[in-house]
């Protein structure tokens, strides 16, 4: 009777949720199964095998809520030297550790906030989206190229030495990158030994021998704009250039952006390897477009400002304090400020200023270049040790409606032409207070 009453009580307690069903089964003594406690001896000395963390990978046994998505839907992504690519989600409290992971995870239109100085050892390459990169609280911060920068591959070049950031397209109609309040420093570093363009297409060429093409590069085949906004600084390029744009890519330098050298005593070299032609310049165009707006600067540079192998160059900012490096640069010291060739077009707008250029010609408009124009208000001035032509033009069109003044062109001309070049000096054109061995215009 007591056992019957106990059974009734236990049934009632189970129904009311006062006891677990396992208690009911054990107490009744006639359950079809039993719950056994694992013996402690079975757990003694047992270890959990940890899998190593690989790039972009996860520990197989690491605790996690869900697998990390390949693209983060958040509009803000965060990166810090104290972050973690494998386990964090890119939030402010759980930042990524590398810019490469951040651009990979970021959705189209996202802003990436760099929260500390970083040393970068792999390319931040992204496809088919537009991103912004800026410094977070406490910035501006500096991202510096590592001496151990990793190679990467694509379908055109196989394995090669990449830029710090690459903006590419495969299917999107528009892509882009905007930098502001951040410093990217190549630190004069390079991987590879040959200063020349890597070879694309079907070839047995070993592209790993070529140095990196830029700090930032875009080979986009759809409209792409790389914008250096206020506070964006590119320093000490160690490869072919600071920024390279080809095909439909466009570079815009807004007011407050700077490309410069800051390393004491730094001079570029092209090495002695076969096939090495030397660095191109701070900006390297191959069919792309450059727009330097008023207030932007290319300054304190060894070698060259702009090298345009095709494309359009529009200068409204300042190019200053550039010393030619005849033994190192591609095309030697021809066009220290701007080198135009291969149907390229160059224009100095009304706010353009070129000054303090030394040891070579300032503007080179030859090699198949199309035209060079100085608009009213533009100036080329204060070049006390030029030792070259201000402008050299061949088989092209030159318009001077700005001012060329205070230039000491030892043993050379202010404007030297060849091969049927058409020259127009506009109503606002002024060539004054210069020293030229052969004359102002020949």
Predicted features along the sequence, with ranges:
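Residue-level detector of conserved, well-ordered beta-strand and adjacent loop positions
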Residues: 79-80, 115, 134, 144, ...
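Extracellular beta-strand-rich solenoid/capping regions of secreted or surface-exposed proteins
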Residues: 104-108, 119-134, 142-225, 240-248, ...
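Glycine-rich repeat segments that build the extracellular carbohydrate-interaction surface of secreted
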Residues: 77-81, 97, 101-120, 132-137, ...
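Right-handed parallel beta-helix
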Residues: 139, 173-188, 201, 205-206, ...
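C-terminal segment of classical bacterial N-terminal signal peptides
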Residues: 15-24
């Amino acid at each position: 009777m007591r056992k019957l009453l106990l059974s009734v009580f236990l049934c009632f307690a189970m129904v009311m949720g006062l006891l677990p069903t396992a208690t009911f089964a054990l107490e009744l003594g006639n359950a079809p199964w039993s719950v056994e406690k694992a013996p402690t001896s079975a757990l003694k000395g047992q270890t959990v095998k940890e899998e190593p963390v690989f790039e972009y990978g996860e520990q197989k046994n690491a605790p996690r809520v869900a697998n990390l998505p390949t693209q983060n839907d958040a509009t803000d992504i965060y990166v810090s030297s104290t972050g973690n690519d494998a386990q964090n989600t890119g939030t402010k409290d759980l930042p990524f550790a590398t810019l490469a992971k951040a651009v990979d995870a970021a959705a189209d239109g996202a802003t990436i906030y760099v929260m500390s100085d970083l040393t970068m050892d792999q390319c931040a390459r992204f496809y088919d989206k537009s991103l912004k990169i800026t410094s977070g609280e406490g910035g501006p911060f500096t991202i510096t190229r590592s001496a151990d920068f990793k190679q990467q591959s694509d379908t055109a070049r196989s394995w090669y030495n990449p830029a710090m950031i690459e903006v590419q397209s495969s299917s999107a109609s528009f892509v882009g990158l905007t930098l502001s309040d951040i410093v990217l420093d190549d630190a004069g570093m390079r991987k590879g030994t040959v200063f020349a363009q890597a070879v694309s297409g079907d070839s047995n060429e070993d592209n790993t021998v070529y140095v990196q093409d830029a700090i930032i590069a875009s080979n986009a085949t759809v409209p792409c704009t790389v914008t250096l906004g206020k506070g964006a600084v590119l320093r000490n390029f160690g490869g072919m250039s600071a920024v390279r744009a080809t095909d439909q890519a466009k570079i815009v330098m807004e007011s407050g952006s700077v490309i410069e050298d800051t390393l004491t005593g730094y001079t570029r070299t092209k090495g002695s390897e076969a096939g090495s032609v030397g660095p191109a310049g701070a900006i390297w165009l191959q069919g792309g477009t450059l727009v330097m707006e008023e207030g932007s600067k290319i300054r304190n540079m060894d070698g060259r400002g702009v090298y345009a192998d095709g494309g359009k160059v529009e200068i409204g900012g300042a190019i200053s304090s550039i010393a030619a490096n005849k033994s190192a640069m591609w095309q030697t010291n021809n066009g220290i400020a701007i080198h135009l060739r291969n149907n390229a077009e160059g224009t100095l707008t009304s706010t353009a200023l070129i000054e303090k250029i030394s040891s070579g010609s300032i503007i080179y408009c030859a090699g198949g270049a199309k035209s060079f124009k100085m608009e009213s208000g533009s100036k080329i001035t204060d070049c006390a040790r030029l030792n070259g032509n201000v402008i050299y033009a061949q088989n092209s069109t030159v318009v001077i409606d700005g001012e060329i003044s205070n230039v000491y062109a030892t043993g050379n001309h202010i404007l030297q032409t060849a091969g049927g070049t058409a020259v127009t000096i506009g109503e606002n054109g002024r060539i004054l207070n210069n020293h030229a061995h052969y004359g102002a215009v020949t």
